[in-house]
C-alpha cells in the first residue's frame, strides 16, 4: 500500500490523474473503474481538461441507486454524464441499471460485464464509516455485485443531494468487495477531516468487515491519496 499525502483536494486529484494518464498512455489501462460522490469530482474536472485520449478506454461504475432512472438528476448515470461522459469521449461506459425490476438478474448482468472488462485501475472514495462503493460495515469480503440496504449514516451523508430527506433512496446496487478487489490497481481518495478516522482504521486497523476499506490492506497494488486533513490521525 503506497501512501501519498498532498496539500489539498486539487493536488491529490492531480496526483491521481497522473497515475491514470500514465496507465492509459502506456496502454496498460483498457478499463477504468469510476466512483461517484463529492470525492472524485475534482479528479473528473482535471481529466476533462487533460489531453489524454480516452476514446479506447471502457469505464465501469461502482454503484447506482435502486429506483432512479438514468435521467434522474440524483442518479449516478446523470452525475457521470454531467461531470465526465458529456465532456470526454470513452469507448463505452457501464453502470448498474437502477430501474431493473429483477435485482438478482441485474447483479448477474453486471458481474458478467466486469468479467468481460477486467478493471485495470479502480478509483475509490471512502465513507465516514469505512464503506467502499455502497459496501457497508458487515459486508462479507467475498461479496459480488449485490443489492444493498443503505445505512442511516450513508443516507444522512447523501441527503444534501436531494430536495427532501424522504427522496433519498433506501437501496442501491453496488459492486461487491470481491468485485472491487479484482481490480489490478486501486486508487483510494480521501479528503477532509471527516474522513480521518476511517482512513486511520483502513490503514492502521485490523482487516475487519466492520471497516470494509480495511480489506485494501490485502490488495497487491493500492495507492492511497489523502490531503493533510484526511491524513491527520495517521
From Swiss-Prot:
Domain of life where this protein originates = Bacteria
Q: Which gene encodes it?
A: nagB
For this protein, the Enzyme Commission number is 3.5.99.6
Q: Could you tell me which species this protein originates from?
A: Listeria monocytogenes serotype 4b (strain CLIP80459)
The residues annotated as the active site are 63 (proton acceptor), 129 (for ring-opening step), 131 (proton acceptor), 136 (for ring-opening step)
GO biological process entries: carbohydrate metabolic process; glucosamine catabolic process; N-acetylglucosamine catabolic process; N-acetylneuraminate catabolic process
Which InterPro entries does this one have?
Glc/Gal-6P_isomerase (IPR006148), Glucosamine6P_isomerase (IPR004547), Glucosamine6P_isomerase_CS (IPR018321), NagB/RpiA_transferase-like (IPR037171)
Record keywords: Carbohydrate metabolism, Hydrolase
Reactions performed catalytically: alpha-D-glucosamine 6-phosphate + H2O = beta-D-fructose 6-phosphate + NH4(+)
GO MF: glucosamine-6-phosphate deaminase activity; identical protein binding
UniProt pathway annotation = Amino-sugar metabolism; N-acetylneuraminate degradation; D-fructose 6-phosphate from N-acetylneuraminate: step 5/5
Regarding protein family, the annotation reads:
Belongs to the glucosamine/galactosamine-6-phosphate isomerase family. NagB subfamily.
Q: What is this protein called?
A: Glucosamine-6-phosphate deaminase
* Protein task: Catalyzes the reversible isomerization-deamination of glucosamine 6-phosphate (GlcN6P) to form fructose 6-phosphate (Fru6P) and ammonium ion.
Q: Name one GO cellular component term.
A: cytoplasm
